[in-house]
Amino acid sequence: PIDPEMCTRCGACVSVCPENAIDASFQIDLDKCKSHRACVTECASIGAINFERTDQAREGEFDLILDLQEIPSIQISQKPQGYFAPGPDPFEQSMAASQLMGMVGEFEKPKYFSYNEKICAHGRNGQVGCSACIDVCSTKAITSSFKNGQGKVEVNPNLCMGCGACATVCPSGAMRYNYPSVAYQGKQVKTLAQTYLGALKSTKAGDAAPSLLIHSQKAGTALLDHLGRAARLHPKETSGLPAFVIPLAVEHIASTGIDLWLGSLAYGFGEVLLLLSGDEDPGYRLALTEQVDLTNSILVAMGYSKRIQCITANASEDIAPVSKVMSELRQRKAHKLLANPASFALSLQKRETLETSLEHLLQFAPQALPAEGVPLPAHSPLGGLIVNKDACTLCMSCVGACPEGALLDNPDEPQLSFIEKQCVQCGLCEQTCPESAITLSPRLRSIEHRKEKVTLNKTEPFHCISCGKAFGTLKMVELMLGRIGSHQAFSGEALERLKMCSDCRVVDMMKKEL
């Protein structure tokens, strides 16, 4: 009944209560209260006590929140900055309070991402296509937004913790990580590869390639420090990093993806190792595992061996799995170069970087890709489409739904064309097609085939039986006549009128009325 925000802590209610039902915390024990309401009378000028008041949900914006509930209001692996939920332990509560007291002043928070709505494949025509970034975000910072049938995603920068997983799983590159960007990381990787390979030129191991070990800045660095100390103290039991393994620290391990990995291989690294140090959200581990499987599938399709590997530890002190992998690498020795080191720079555009890296690796691939391509996992951003020509009426709904311009129509004749290089396998065309005539086909084909504009379906135009003007496709009109031709409303002359263009139908109806 006592509103803590209105209460002035004067203590008048405590003094006048005959049952001593109000304690020093200014809470009323309703089991003791006999409803004399002397406290209400005493507090009339303030109005802080009201037995008729019901619980109301309140909203507000705060920089710092101390949640003392046993079950916190926010239950996600990465809590927002400024939110503390220490639980019921008094010691943890005091530690959280101490941290809060020190958080005074103004702080700058980087904007980790940039978003290009134009190439986002989230939604068109009221249909949802890709929602990979929404599904993977552990802080729930990304939400879906539709306006006039057009879908996009919105990111709350205050909830974003900079993991970068959204950019890793984004097939189109609409979501881009900027802390740092792939272009900046590409310069780092290129410099590391060139320096290492340059030092090996004068040795017999000139064709050996270094291994790139990517790890998170905080937990990953701590894990490698533990590994290094253990290897110095117990060299027989613990294996440190071999000389050909080059570590690279990033803000968060989930921020790296297929574009940086393939770019690293193109620059001269023999393999890419991803160190998971135990502080990642389970969803991030799953996403990285899927991306690793996809990248290895692409490499195997080109005739290479699997060159991307996850090293999974459960904490920064869990050095055993890392030591085991390092021991295996030391015995195996360094990989050979996959291809001549590339000279191109990684782009800010994910698809451009991906295509450039693929083209370089395909140039030196041990085997050529078959014309029909090699199947890839279902979550692949690369692939084509299969169109059921018997079901397709060439209504071109798919063309209007495609956000990447992979599907094209022909203004001169009923024809559906496709450029596989542009397709991100978002599924919007499949969702939009009224005849369910489109099926996604994740696969890897040669660069020449992927750049080629191919015709998926075409038919003859239907001409108005009155004026001869083309106003639809032959298949569409035949399908329409087959579906509604038996209805009594379209018998006789009315059925023939369906074979006319819109102008001639009006003229024909006016003639019949006159």
Regions found by a protein language model. Give the residues of each.
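Mobile, glycine- and charge-enriched loop segments
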Residues: 219-254
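Ferredoxin-type iron-sulfur electron-transfer modules and their immediate structural context
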Residues: 1-136, 140, 209-222, 285, ...
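Terminal amphipathic helices with adjacent charged low-complexity linkers/tails
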Residues: 37, 146-193, 286-291, 308-314
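Long, compositionally biased charged/polar accessory segments in the mid-to-C-terminal portions
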Residues: 241-245, 267-271, 276, 470-475, ...
